[in-house]
């Protein structure tokens, strides 16, 4: 492919509105352009990368018997009313009317559509299982689109749906998809973890997220690629190294979620779902009597603890939530933080929000800072974190402004439902007892759910089972964020390329180091002087030879300065660069491996053979 024929609008500078390196490089390297807020055009390079990823997906899904189809993006609102999500999905749902004033939506996901199609076509367990998927654009009216392709209003997604006559059959397909996803993301060159996830708006129970890890850019050996003009990091002056470190640190780590993972086992979970090893403790101290103490001007846990000279771990944090219009009291050990996802899931609530100060005062008789679990109205629902039951003689609010109660003992002074509702902390023991929890940032690239009968129940999707009984179809759901894969790969494979000029100056610039499977082309073939006919002829021969061996070749045939060509090549990020330069008449070309910065000169006749050796090594 001739570069002069492609739309690759590279920029000299990083875009000023970009906060994450993937967004900056996609724009600067000419992969994407924003059309309006949260809406992007995928230019030829991005489209080629996305198509390569689609090919990987299709190959892996064929292995597990998944069949591709295409559903409409424009959906009738009636289907979403059937499932109940038209009202509950929230403001992210694009709603519109046609000329007949009928309600429609732009699909953010397609559970209802696929359920309806199968409901109307499948009547017997003998017609199951079915394993269907599609790849198409989705729409969500994001309040604040940001970070390039990571949070957009239109995005490309692969969503799959499986249909079964029982849960045992679903379990088999779920495991097939889990393995297929691992194969897909491995082939795509991603550093990822499969983690325990939350079903969220999908309505699933068991689920697993696949997170592309976005580590801090502190490891120079990983993030910096040295040109052949620099032997090692030790040769770079200290002041230049400090500049390089500052440039690496200047770009925000783009991971949208925090994950907790074990240092010694396979345990990993989204922070919203992560738990830790818990061991109930026996009470050894005698229980004190309750005593009300004045705590003037103490509104926070740390202020109360300091005033009473107790540790924060001996205090009870009392919170009030409204769950589906019903008040729920939540209790935590004072230095812990509430995990609202865990609480919402435990309550099986559709809506959960913190109560207002007015609501708290009406319920407790006091304002924030003085709330506690003692002497609440009969029938009050109290959900306490499991650590609370280990407390003896704790401090809690007295439900009287400016006062607290000491000597509070769970079981004696209040009754509660005990469950894990806290956020885990880094360094705590993994729940499986192996290793401690560490945190990392990550980008969600895939998610699989066991939906069960959530949609078949609400939409009447039933079959006759082997005993002739009418039963709901059991479903699974499997998504991959196709367009955000591009962002995730660039976040992990962006590199700072450093070289030394003939005058001894050090220069560095960002570029992409695409893994071979997703690079838009395999080889960047550059002619230094397009007016040199010998070089032109050699370039044409090499292009034909490479293509005959199955290489995708981008040939830079532009009449541009060589420095501009090399800068664009570093930005675009193809794995191999072959330069036809001053030694073209001698039949000598230069090969450069992008990942390492290594370069060698070879006879053009030996190019293919040399590339085969080099690509095996790297």
From Swiss-Prot:
Pfam families given in the database record: HGTP_anticodon, tRNA-synt_2b, tRNA_edit
Domain of life of the source: Bacteria
Reaction catalysis annotation: tRNA(Pro) + L-proline + ATP = L-prolyl-tRNA(Pro) + AMP + diphosphate
Gene3D superfamilies assigned: Anticodon-binding domain, Bira Bifunctional Protein, Domain 2, YbaK/aminoacyl-tRNA synthetase-associated domain
Main localization category: cytoplasm
Family matches, as CDD domains: ProRS-INS (cd04334), ProRS_anticodon_short (cd00861)
One Gene Ontology cellular component: cytosol
Subcellular location: Cytoplasm
Enzyme nomenclature, EC number: 6.1.1.15
Keywords: Aminoacyl-tRNA synthetase, ATP-binding, Cytoplasm, Ligase, Nucleotide-binding, Protein biosynthesis
Gene Ontology MF terms in the entry: aminoacyl-tRNA deacylase activity; ATP binding; catalytic activity, acting on a protein; proline-tRNA ligase activity; transferase activity
InterPro entries linked: aa-tRNA-synt_IIb (IPR002314), aa-tRNA-synth_II (IPR006195), aa-tRNA-synth_II/BPL/LPL (IPR045864), Anticodon-bd (IPR004154), Anticodon-bd_dom_sf (IPR036621), Pro-tRNA-ligase_IIa (IPR002316), Pro-tRNA-synth_IIa_bac-type (IPR004500), Pro-tRNA-Synthase_IIa_type1 (IPR023717)
Keyword Cell division carried by entry: no
GO biological process: one example: prolyl-tRNA aminoacylation
Free-text note regarding domains: Consists of three domains: the N-terminal catalytic domain, the editing domain and the C-terminal anticodon-binding domain.
Family: Belongs to the class-II aminoacyl-tRNA synthetase family. ProS type 1 subfamily.
Subunit structure: Homodimer.
Function: Catalyzes the attachment of proline to tRNA(Pro) in a two-step reaction: proline is first activated by ATP to form Pro-AMP and then transferred to the acceptor end of tRNA(Pro). As ProRS can inadvertently accommodate and process non-cognate amino acids such as alanine and cysteine, to avoid such errors it has two additional distinct editing activities against alanine. One activity is designated as 'pretransfer' editing and involves the tRNA(Pro)-independent hydrolysis of activated Ala-AMP.
Name of this protein: Proline--tRNA ligase
Originating species: Streptococcus pyogenes serotype M3 (strain ATCC BAA-595 / MGAS315)
């Amino acid at each position: 492919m001739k570069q002069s024929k492609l739309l690759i609008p590279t920029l000299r500078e990083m875009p000023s509105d970009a906060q994450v390196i993937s967004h900056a490089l996609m724009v600067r390297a000419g992969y994407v352009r924003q059309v309006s807020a949260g809406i992007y055009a995928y230019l030829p390079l991005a489209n080629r990368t996305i198509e390569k990823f689609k090919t990987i997906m299709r190959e892996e899904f064929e292995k597990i018997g998944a069949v591709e189809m295409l559903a409409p993006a424009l959906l009738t609102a009636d289907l979403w009313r059937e499932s109940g999500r038209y009202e509950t999905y929230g403001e992210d749902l694009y709603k519109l009317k046609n000329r007949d004033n009928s309600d429609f939506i732009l699909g953010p996901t397609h559970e209802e559509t696929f359920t309806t199609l199968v409901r109307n076509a499948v009547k017997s367990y003998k017609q199951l299982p079915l394993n269907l998927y599609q790849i198409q654009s989705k729409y969500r009216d994001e309040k604040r689109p940001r970070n390039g392709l990571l949070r957009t209003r239109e995005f490309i997604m692969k969503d799959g749906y499986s249909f079964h006559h029982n849960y045992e059959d679903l379990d088999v397909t779920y495991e097939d998809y889990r393995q297929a996803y691992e194969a897909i993301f491995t082939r795509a060159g991603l550093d990822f973890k499969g983690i325990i996830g939350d079903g969220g708006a999908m309505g699933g129970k068991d689920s697993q997220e696949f997170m592309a890890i976005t580590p801090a850019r502190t490891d120079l050996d990983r993030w910096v690629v040295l040109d052949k003009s620099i032997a090692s990091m030790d040769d770079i002056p200290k002041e230049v190294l400090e500049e390089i470190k500052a440039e690496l640190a200047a770009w925000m780590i783009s991971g949208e979620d925090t994950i907790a993972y074990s240092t010694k086992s396979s345990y990993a979970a989204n922070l919203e779902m992560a738990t830790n090893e818990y061991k109930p403790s026996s009470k050894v101290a005698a229980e004190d009597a309750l005593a009300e103490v004045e705590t003037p001007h103490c509104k926070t846990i740390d202020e109360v603890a300091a005033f009473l000279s107790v540790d924060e771990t001996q205090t009870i944090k009392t919170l009030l939530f409204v769950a589906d219009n019903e008040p729920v009291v939540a209790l935590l050990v004072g230095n812990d933080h509430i995990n609202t996802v865990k609480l919402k899931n435990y309550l099986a609530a559709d809506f959960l929000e913190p109560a207002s100060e007015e609501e708290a005062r009406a319920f407790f008789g006091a304002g924030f800072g003085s709330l506690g679990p003692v002497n609440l109205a009969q029938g009050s629902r109290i959900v306490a974190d499991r650590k609370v039951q280990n407390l003896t003689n704790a401090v809690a609010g007295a439900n009287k402004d400016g006062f607290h109660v000491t000597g509070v003992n769970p079981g004696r002074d209040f009754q509660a439902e005990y469950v894990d509702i806290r956020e885990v902390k880094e360094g705590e023991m993994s729940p499986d007892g192996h290793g401690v929890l560490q945190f990392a940032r990550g980008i969600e690239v895939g998610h699989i759910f066991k939906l069960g009968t959530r949609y078949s129940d609400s939409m009447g999707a039933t079959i006759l089972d082997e005993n002739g009984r009418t039963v709901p179809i059991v479903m699974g759901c499997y998504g991959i964020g196709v367009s955000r894969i591009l962002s995730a790969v660039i976040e992990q494979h962006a590199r700072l390329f450093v070289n030394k000029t003939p005058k001894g100056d050090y220069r560095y610039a960002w570029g992409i180091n695409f893994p071979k499977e997703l690079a838009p082309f395999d080889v960047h073939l550059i002619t230094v002087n397009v007016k040199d006919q010998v070089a032109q002829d050699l370039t044409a021969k090499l292009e034909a030879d490479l293509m005959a061996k199955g290489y995708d070749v981008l040939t830079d045939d532009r009449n541009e300065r060589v420095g501009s060509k090399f800068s664009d090549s570093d930005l675009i990020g193809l794995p191999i660069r072959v330069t036809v330069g001053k030694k073209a008449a001698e039949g000598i070309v230069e090969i450069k491996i992008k990942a390492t910065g290594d370069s060698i000169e070879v006879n053009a006749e030996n190019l293919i053979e040399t590339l085969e050796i080099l690509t095996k090594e790297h």
